[in-house]
Amino acid sequence: LLSRGLGDVYKRQEGEGAWSFTVMFLQMWNYFRYSEGSYLSYKPEVDFSNIEDGYVQPYKSSPLTGENVGENLYIQMINDAQEYIYIFTPYLIVCNELMTALKLAAKRDVDVRIVTPAIPDKKYIYKMTQSNYKELLLAGVRIYQYTPGFIHSKTLIMDGRLASVGSINMDNRSFYHHFECGALLYDCKAIADVKNDMFATFEESEEIDILWCRNNISKVSLIGPLLNLLSPLL
């Protein structure tokens, strides 16, 4: 769950799901070593008979799969939301499809909230993130900046029944260029813990409004669109 200050979410995975993450790592390892081999020798002989509630589906997103798994998953969760979708992301550099999905969700009365850092790690990425605030706010999306520190979490929760916890940022590097992974949680007890953590984070964060955009427009609007031209490379 969320680590205060850094603003990250950690998840412990046991059982068959943990083996899936091992296979993801070995596939990437073998790719860079230009080698092939069986992974079964790395599989531990442990009892996986302890059945918990709900389902956990590990997934990976990489430039080798031929499909943008992370981006597609995020868009699908936003499109499927009926009541709410809450998103934590260090960077908010979104393509037209993702921007449209967020705006349409808010316009159909889905409670859409996004938390980004108040303290950046990269100033130019920070400006690009903020340059997207106004368009989303005008559509009804609620945006927060995490004031205690940098938020590193990449977490989505939808309608209290589906959540994604992983390494995929909302930017082109994560969606198209990086080896990333995550876990999709469905009807698990842990989803309630994630939601409670998110509401605690909302309380610690500053909610951004149109007035904030107006007060900062000269700082953000001039450089943001210029940097957005470079977003396919970032």
Label each region the model flagged:
Residues 1-10:
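Single conserved hydrophobic/aromatic residue that forms the stacking wall/gate
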Residues 16, 21, 27-76:
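Active-site cores of enzymes that catalyze phosphoryl transfer or operate on phosphate-rich substrates
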Residues 50-51, 79, 174-175:
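Short, flexible turn/loop "capping" segments at secondary-structure junctions
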Residues 70-84, 107:
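Long hydrophobic segments that form regular secondary structure
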Residues 84-86, 91-234:
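PLD/PLD-like phosphodiesterase catalytic module centered on the HKD motif
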